[in-house]
Structure formats: C-alpha cells, structure tokens
A protein has these predicted regions:
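N-terminal Rossmann-like FAD-binding beta1-loop-alpha1 element of flavoenzymes
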Residues: 1-18
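Hydrophobic/aromatic-enriched cytosolic interaction surfaces used to assemble or bind macromolecules
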Residues: 19-301
C-alpha cells in the first residue's frame, strides 16, 4: 500500500510538470553530471581560467579563459567571474583550485606536520594575506607545502561544498615523472608557464632537484637551465634536456641550448598525449592537459 501511495504521488508530480518518467530521468542526467564533476580553477598571479569534463562538447572538455581586470586581486576577479562565467554559473559542487605559488617539497618520509610551518618560514616568505597548506604527492614520495591567498580560498570555499587545493605543477610533475623512466639516461625538465620557468629532475622515484625562476626572457631562461645542468653534473652529450609549455622564442631557445646540450627536446603535446582531442583546444595550458588527458576518473578525484 505504501508503495502504491508513493507511486501515485510521483505520477501526480510528473503530470503536474507535464513530464513522462523517461523525460524526468533524462532531465536529471545533467544534474547528476554537475554533482559528480570536479571543476578546475586555474589561478596564477595574472590569469584565471576554468575547465571541466563535458561530454556534450567534441573535445570532452570545456575550457574557459577569463579576462582578468588589472588593479584588483585574483580573489576579486574570481568573485566577478561568478556573475558571468559559463562554467561557474553551472552550479558545480566540487572544485580543484590550482594555485601558482612557490612550493617547498619535503620528502614524504621526513614530513612532520608539527614542524612544517617553521621549516616553511625558513625557506619561503609567508605573507599576512596568505595561509600555508600542504598536499601529499604519493607518486613522487613528497609533500608539497605552499601558500594560498586567504581571500581566494574564501571565495572558493563559499561557492563549493568539496574543495581541493593543489599546486599548479602537480599534473606536470606526475606526467613527466612517469615519462622519466623511458630510457636509461638522466633527464632535466624545464616547464614554461605564466612568465615562470620551473626546472626539475627525478631519480629513484623522487625529486632530485626542483626550483622556479621568474622570467619571460629566453636568454635568462637559457642561463638558469644551464646553471642547473652544470650544478647537477649532467653530461652534455649523453643526458637529456626536455622543454615544455609556453616557451619564449621557442626556436631560438632550442637551438641555443643545443649548442651546449646535444639531446635537447621540445615536447609536442599532440604526440605527447597520443593525439588526445583536448590537445586541439586553443590556449589550453600544458599543465591542464596533464590533468585531463587521463580522463574523467582522474580529473574528478
């Protein structure tokens, strides 16, 4: 009897809305996708963009750069974006905030949460407007400790039920760490993004080196890379240098480095990601490709 009453109420509800049961099920499918999908917010010092898996578009990914207003903070720009952004207005409940701030990497077997704040203060500058958080990188046997702006964090927390905050470089580190096992020679990686150069290397399933330099100059980038190359004792004939991202003066940079490092390579995202459809999205940063190319399961975690 109880089941009949429930069925009658459901039928009456559908009749009032002039929907049949099949239409009702179809109508809830987009809502379920919104509930389950994790929106990615990429925030740097001067840019904002949003991305989410979307099966209704050809590339299976909806990427939306946002034009920031100069003179106001990233947090203030994000508040404004919630009024106009197509993705932000969809009502996603889960978000992954990627922040581009200096990262202190701690070996996972040496990480002590009670000591990390003091260690961070000795290594980095923590502004009053920032709060310090950490993120475990299990594949790399490290913990990333970094700062996030309090106002930016508050804006995201106010709009989403489930929020994760990760370093912008996490996807790049993980992707290139997997590729580092190809071949027997040592490899140095240089990733260019947002007027910043990230240089890092791996060995025995962990970081051997990682540092970042603020530059958009190909000449300065070349100097920084070769300085690290020499510091790490790499072989200029046998070992490998891999460049990726938004490389300034790409042809000049590669040719200039080839004079000193014979095995210098520039990543081709189309080949790197096996012709994945997302590589055709104009303006999609390499770091976002590394997150989404593995599919909806990884991007929604």
């Amino acid at each position: 009897m109880r089941g009949n009453i429930a069925g009658l109420m459901c039928a009456q509800h559908l009749a009032r809305r002039r929907l049949n049961p099949t239409q009702a099920m179809q109508e809830t499918a987009p809502d379920l996708h919104i509930q389950q999908t994790r929106l990615v917010i990429r925030a740097t010092r001067n840019t904002l963009s949003f991305a989410a898996v979307d099966p209704t578009v050809q590339t299976n990914l909806f990427f939306e750069p946002y034009t920031v207003r100069s003179g106001i903070s990233v947090a203030a720009n994000l508040r404004e974006a919630f009024k106009t952004s197509t993705l932000l207005l969809r009502g996603y409940k889960r978000a992954n905030l990627l922040v581009d701030t200096p990262v202190m990497l701690v070996p996972i077997d040496e990480f002590q949460e009670e000591d990390v704040r003091q260690l961070y203060h000795r290594t980095m500058v923590l502004a009053d407007a920032d709060t310090m958080i950490h993120h475990v990188l299990p594949d790399l046997n490290a913990v990333a400790v970094f700062a996030v702006n309090k106002d930016l964090k508050l804006v995201v927390d106010d709009h989403f039920v489930d929020v994760r905050i990760t370093p912008l470089m996490k996807g790049v580190w993980t992707h290139l760490h997997r590729r580092s096992f190809t071949g027997s020679r040592r490899k140095l990686y240089a990733y260019f993004h947002d007027k910043r150069l990230e240089v890092f290397s791996f060995g025995k399933n962990r970081f051997k080196f990682s540092n970042a330099f603020d530059t958009n100059s190909s000449r300065d980038a070349m100097y920084f890379i070769l300085y690290v190359w020499k510091q790490m004792g790499f072989d200029s004939v046998q070992d490998e240098l891999h460049l990726s991202g938004d490389i300034p003066d790409k042809d000049w940079t590669k040719n200039a480095l080839l004079e000193f490092v014979k095995k210098t390579y520039v990543a081709n995202p189309v080949a790197d990601f096996n012709r994945a459809p997302i590589t055709a999205i104009e303006g999609l940063p390499y770091d976002l490709m590394t997150i989404f190319v593995r599919g909806i399961k990884d991007s929604n975690r």
